[in-house]
Amino acid sequence: MERPEQELIRQSWRAVSRSPLEHGTVLFARLFDLEPDLLPLFQYNCRQFSSPEDCLSSPEFLDHIRKVMLVIDAAVTNVEDLSSLEEYLAGLGRKHRAVGVRFSSFSTVGESLLYMLEKCLGPAFTPATRAAWSQLYGAVVQAMSRGWDGE
């Protein structure tokens, strides 16, 4: 990824990172809209959520949202050298596989991430910014896939 794309990612993330829980909730609400079959994968203390709203308001799930936003923050921070996160991201891949997430669902997560960024940034979410984020997300998923494949 070239320096201009890295800067677009950093600039846009500054706006998002001011309210990570709020924007992360938008991401997951969109994810559940697009792929409702993911909802049953989120259980805390053997509690099954009856609706996306029920899930999105639970303290345990809000903690999950915070963690996801921290992973995105780490990717942004290390955008010039994502290889420094390879092992960590492969481990996340293994964890997601272990709880029953299908690898194909990460495409929907990517769509949800772009949706959240567009809602947060409005007109500042340009085609160039979208392309930069798509490239970053693709690299993150590629690293996570190594955990899926057991490499």
From Swiss-Prot:
PANTHER family: BLR2807 PROTEIN, NEUROGLOBIN. The keyword Cytoplasm applies. Gene3D superfamilies: Globins (1.10.490.10). Heme b binds at H64, H96. Residues 1-149 form the Globin domain. One of its GO terms (cellular component) is mitochondrial matrix. Monomer. Homodimer and homotetramer; disulfide-linked. Mainly monomeric but also detected as part of homodimers and homotetramers. Interacts with 14-3-3 proteins; regulates the phosphorylation of NGB. Could interact (ferrous form) with G-alpha(i) proteins (GTP-bound form). This is Neuroglobin. Belongs to the globin family. It catalyses: Fe(III)-heme b-[protein] + nitric oxide + H2O = Fe(II)-heme b-[protein] + nitrite + 2 H(+). Its EC number is 1.7.-.-. It is found in: Cytoplasm, Cytosol; Mitochondrion matrix. GO terms for biological process: cellular response to hypoxia. InterPro entries: Globin, Globin-like_OT, Globin-like_sf, Globin/Proto. Keywords: Cytoplasm, Disulfide bond, Heme, Iron, Metal-binding, Mitochondrion, Oxidoreductase. Transmembrane segments: none annotated. The keyword Mitochondrion applies. Monomeric globin with a bis-histidyl six-coordinate heme-iron atom through which it can bind dioxygen, carbon monoxide and nitric oxide. Could help transport oxygen and increase its availability to the metabolically active neuronal tissues, though its low quantity in tissues as well as its high affinity for dioxygen, which may limit its oxygen-releasing ability, argue against it. The ferrous/deoxygenated form exhibits a nitrite reductase activity and it could produce nitric oxide which in turn inhibits cellular respiration in response to hypoxia. One of its GO terms (molecular function) is GDP-dissociation inhibitor activity. Phosphorylated during hypoxia by ERK1/ERK2. Phosphorylation regulates the heme pocket hexacoordination preventing the association of His-64 with the heme metal center. Thereby, promotes the access of dioxygen and nitrite to the heme and stimulates the nitrite reductase activity. Phosphorylation during hypoxia is stabilized by 14-3-3 proteins.
